[in-house]
Every structure is written in structure tokens, then in C-alpha cells.
């Protein structure tokens, strides 16, 4: 009776033990496999795996029908086995004791392991989904920024095209201004070198004609628009500038004449409503020539180069003094001529008084004399 009771109790206790634990205990307790796996010599509640390769090839297929060593280790962790030594495959459990197989019923499988792994996996999936959603939002924001930048780039390109067009127009205007400045400087240099040229240009050509008064000068009658002839009894004097051998002054006079006619300068000089033309007393120190040479759009002519070269090489101290005196006379004569032209007589219609006619004749002869002395 007692024997049967013990047997029944043993069978009931063994039936409550998990198959993995029972097989693992038999494998460790087998003395024939002590070279592969055995009880730990330092403790009764632990065992050590000595040869993992042979253990995976021979013992695992024999007891568990697989040869996966990692799966065996994972099963040990599920049942609460812990690794004792980090350098060896030694595992211990308080219910896994040598010679006390009945204590295996105290070893309980941990159920929260699978749930924790599952929850960990779920949390990982949730985190990944959140990160993915955040990345997609950033992509959408970047797309919007790209569209805004594209529109701004189009506006900048349009503004650049408009600016380039304005710059081209501005360059054309600046070039025209430089050309006009160059023409004006050329004219001023020409007048400073030949003051008689200005007197010739200021004489009206259409209604009044001046000629040199000499012996036997004839009195010319001026015919008005109504066909009436007005005789003033005055000699008509025309000013003839001194002719150079090379004929340079004549060609320059024609060019300047055309320039002044195009610019309506003659009308401006003879109009009483405008400010009177005043020719200042200036010394010929070569400033106009220097300014002309420094002009950005300057086109040098042979005459200008010869003048500059002559002024640098051949001008002596005595010549400078003489030139200064002559230029003072020129400036003074130009001033007198301008004052005579500004007097409120009916100069435009040729009604000159004898006194003014004589003054102009004297001034003209003096200007001719100064021009011939050059």
C-alpha cells in the first residue's frame, strides 16, 4: 500500500513538471555525458556545458529534436535559469538541485516574458510609425518651401531682366553724354586756341554781312521783306579769319559752325530774353587740353597730339610770358565783343549806329592782328 502510494505520488509530481525541465535534468544527471555537460563542482544547483559544439550536435537532437543552441539558452531563461559565470556556459536555478529531482515542480515558467517581448515589439512598431509620420510631415513642409522658393526665384529672374534692360539704356545715355562732352571740349579747346573763330560764329549770316572797310568801300542797300531798300550809309564789313597754310582752321570752323547751328546756339546768343553771353578772362594754361586728353571717350586727332607735343617740348620761359600776354589780350577782346553784341540796339535787323559800327570794326581788326601774331 505504501509502495503504491509512493509510486502514485511520484507519478503525480513528475506529471506536474515541465517536459523541458525533466529532460534537461536527465541530460545533466547522466554520468556518461560528463565530458559534454555535467553538474557544477562548486554548487549543487547549477550545471555547466563544457563543449557547446558536441552538445548542439549530439545531445540536443537526442533530447529535444533540434540542434539550435540559442533556442536552448532562451528556454533556460524562460524557466528562470541565470548565467553564473560570464566566461563559461554555467546556469543555476534554486529548483534545479542535484539529487533532488522533486524540486523541479518549484521551477515555474515565466509567462510575462512573451507578453513583454510582444509589448516591446508593439512599442517599437508604434515608435517607428510615429517617426515615419513625422518624416512625411517634414517632407510635405519641404515641398511647400520648395514651391515658395521657386516662385521667389522666378520673381528675382524677372527683376534681373528688367534691371539689365535699364542698365543697357543707361549705358546708351552715358555714352551719348560722353560724346556730347567730347564735342564740347573739342569746341572749347578750338576757341581757346583761335578766339577769332568765336567772333566769326557770332556774326549773323542771313541779314547782316560784314566786310573789311577799305578805300573805296561801297554802301550797300538792304532790301526788307516789303521790298523797301534801306540805306544806312555804312560800309559793310565782313570778318575774314586768318587762313593757315594747312587749312586746318577752315575745316574746324565749318565743323563747329554745323555743331552750333544744330544746337541752336546762335539763336541763344542773340536772344535778348536769355542771360547775356559772358566770355571770362582765362589764362591759357592748357587745362582744356588736359581735360580733353583725360576724357574717357576721347578720340585723338593728329592736330591735338601735335599741340600737346609742342606744348611739352618747345615751350620756353619767354614763350610762356608772351603767350600769357596774348591770352590776356584775347580774353579782353572777347569780352569787349560780347559787350558790344549785348547792347540793346536793333542788331538783329541791321540797324547799327555809326559809333557801334566803328567799334566793331576796330575790335575786328585787333582780333585779326592778334590771330595773325600767333
Curated annotation (Swiss-Prot):
Disulfide bonds: none annotated. A motif (AHA1) lies at residues 285-294. Gene3D superfamilies: Winged helix-like DNA-binding domain superfamily/Winged helix DNA-binding domain (1.10.10.10). Keywords: Activator, Cytoplasm, DNA-binding, Nucleus, Phosphoprotein, Repeat, Stress response, Transcription, Transcription regulation. The keyword Cytoplasm applies. Residues 17-112 bind DNA. The keyword Membrane does not apply. It is found in: Cytoplasm; Nucleus. A motif (AHA2) lies at residues 330-339. Exhibits temperature-dependent phosphorylation. A motif (Nuclear export signal) lies at residues 363-370. InterPro entries: HSF_DNA-bd, WH-like_DNA-bd_sf, WH_DNA-bd_sf. GO terms for cellular component: cytoplasm; nucleus. It holds the Pfam family HSF_DNA-bind. GO terms for molecular function: DNA-binding transcription factor activity; transcription cis-regulatory region binding. A motif (Nuclear localization signal) lies at residues 298-303. Residues 126-192 are annotated as: Hydrophobic repeat HR-A/B. Homotrimer. The hydrophobic-rich region (HR-A/B) corresponds to the oligomerization domain. AHA motifs are transcriptional activator elements. Transcriptional activator that specifically binds DNA sequence 5'-AGAAnnTTCT-3' known as heat shock promoter elements (HSE). Belongs to the HSF family. Class A subfamily. This is Heat stress transcription factor A-8. It comes from Arabidopsis thaliana.
